[in-house]
């Protein structure tokens, strides 16, 4: 079986986890609320703009203030809190998976 097939199997296994199901459910709640969905998408755009490309320290600081303000406004919304919690749990699962892959590769280099 090829590497692409194994990667597909890994993705399917990740999608079969409780963490993914909870994240998907939390995202669906946000997606049903047009206004909230728009605010979350705007927050993601601001994050991407901050972390992509080369910008001056002053511009980065300005964007960070904007991002912090947007996050602060959303942080009081229960649906957003749930989305962030489930996203964090799923990211922990991904990090653990990547750590295990890395350890296996490192062991193979010895």
Which ranges hold each PLM region?
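Terminal, compositionally biased segments used for targeting/anchoring and flexible tails
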Residues: 1-110
